[in-house]
Regions:
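Solvent-exposed alpha-helices and their adjacent loops that cap or buttress functional pockets
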Residues: 49-52, 73-74, 92-95, 111, ...
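Conserved oxyanion/phosphate-binding beta-strand-loop segments in alpha/beta enzyme cores
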Residues: 1
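A general secondary-structure junction signal
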Residues: 17, 185, 230-232
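Charged (often Lys/Glu-rich) extended helix/loop segments that serve as interaction or gating elements
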Residues: 198, 208-218, 227-403
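Active-site-proximal beta-alpha core segment in soluble small-molecule metabolic enzymes
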Residues: 11-180, 187, 192-193, 202-207, ...
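Short, solvent-exposed coil/turn linker segments
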Residues: 53, 122, 222, 398-399
Length: 403
């Protein structure tokens, strides 16, 4: 969060609840002052149940069920996105006083999870949508975009900001004075500074202070000027969670199997207590690549966080080719068809997977009657000052009014 404040002080983060709705995560981010990007009434209710004001929520789902719109109106959630005429008609009928944000289509080809195939109005459609909103006497207050989840090309944000400015200008032509820009998500840890630099440059070029700061020429009648928000999800939580899995079974390949396959056959198949129907659904739905590190061998702790996978010294342990599987009876429940782990690894030992905080447990199922992995929160032994600050913030959530 402090890194965000340092690099993007002009932009208020609205955490994407869908990414990881663990209560402690939400409480900590609420105490830090973030808003919340909610995609359903259930997520909205989760935030409201924390005692937060509806003003800290954007209902960032352009295509909502009518019943959800009615519920949002009853919950006093008054900011949502749209990208089509039917949604405007729906809003007019069920939530006519809601403030609307037009989601535009951007180039998301440089992202791991591309969303443009499902959401976002092309720029050529913007005039028609704004004309319909004007006809229905609806209040369109701004523009949003999303470059896709897990964006690996910072320049995608520059192009998206350029398109957003085009939509802002179209809004003025239709009598709207927009004062909200929602730059969506797509933020990654490894290139965050590069993305932030592109955003600062793009915003300075297309949304300069002289035009969009309070009193600016493009925000007449808007005392607060242009408000810029974002919807980061994995940026906040991906690296904050690690998943430890227990090896519940092992199947060794017969020597003749390995010989017949020319050595390509895994010498061992390990079965662990979480799989693709659990936290590892991220492999299928979020296109994540995971690599295990060894936590224990022969019930002895061997994990080293300073080494790449498998997290043990090769001089200390002989590695062999193997595969890793989840606990269900479905053959699609495969974590890795080929990796290398210590030959001494046995039933009862543990593996650990880093960067498992985003789009993992939130989509886990109970297939085969199995329960999702439990979450345990720790504060670390080498960050006492940070730990104390976190505990203080969480305590403030429980005691204070955060509205």
């Amino acid at each position: 969060y402090l890194r965000w404040q340092r690099e993007l002080p002009r932009i208020v983060p609205f955490y994407a609840v869908k990414c990881n709705p663990e209560p402690v995560v939400l409480q900590l981010l609420a105490a830090l002052g973030t808003g919340f990007d909610c995609a359903s009434n259930g997520e909205i209710q989760t935030i409201l149940d924390m005692g937060l004001s509806p003003s800290r929520i954007i209902y960032a789902n352009p295509c909502k069920a009518s019943s959800f719109v009615r519920r949002a109106a009853s919950q006093n959630v008054s900011l949502t996105t749209f990208d089509n005429v039917d949604e405007l008609v729906k809003m007019k009928r069920f939530h006519p006083d809601c403030k609307l944000v037009l989601r535009i289509l951007t180039d998301d080809s440089k992202s791991v999870c591309q969303l443009g195939i499902k959401f976002g109005a092309p720029l050529k459609e913007v005039p028609r949508l704004l004309a319909k909103a004007r006809e229905l006497e609806l209040d369109v207050v701004g523009v949003s975009f999303h470059v896709g989840s897990g964006c690996y090309d910072p320049e995608a944000f520059r192009d998206a900001v350029f398109r957003a400015r085009k939509a802002f200008d179209m809004g003025r032509e239709h009598g709207f004075i927009f004062d909200l820009l929602d730059i969506g998500g797509g933020f990654e840890h490894f290139n965050f500074e590069a993305i932030a630099a592109v955003l600062r440059s793009g915003l300075a070029e297309h949304f300069p202070d002289e035009a969009f700061a309070p009193g600016g020429t493009h925000v007449e009648g808007k005392p607060s000027g242009l408000r810029i928000i974002a919807e980061p999800g994995r940026y906040f939580v991906q690296s904050a969670f690690v998943l430890a899995t227990n090896i519940i079974a092992r199947r060794l390949s017969a020597e003749d199997e390995a010989a017949e396959s020319g050595g390509a056959q895994p010498e061992a198949m390990y079965y662990q207590n979480d799989g693709t129907y659990g936290a590892f659904n991220c492999i299928m739905f979020d296109h994540q690549t995971v690599q295990p590190k060894v936590l224990s061998v022969s019930e002895q702790f061997v994990y080293r966080d300073d080494l790449p996978a498998p997290g043990v010294g090769t001089a200390q342990f002989e590695l062999r080719p193997c595969s890793v599987w989840g606990p269900t009876c479905d053959s699609i429940d495969c974590i890795l068809r080929m990796t290398h782990l210590p030959s001494a690894l046995d039933v009862g030992d543990w593996l650990v997977y880093e960067n498992m905080g985003a789009y993992t447990l939130c989509a886990a199922s109970s297939f085969n009657g199995l329960s999702p992995s439990k979450v345990r929160f720790t504060i670390g032994s080498d960050a006492s000052d940070d730990a104390a600050a976190v505990l203080c913030l969480l305590d403030s959530v429980r005691r204070a009014d955060l509205c």
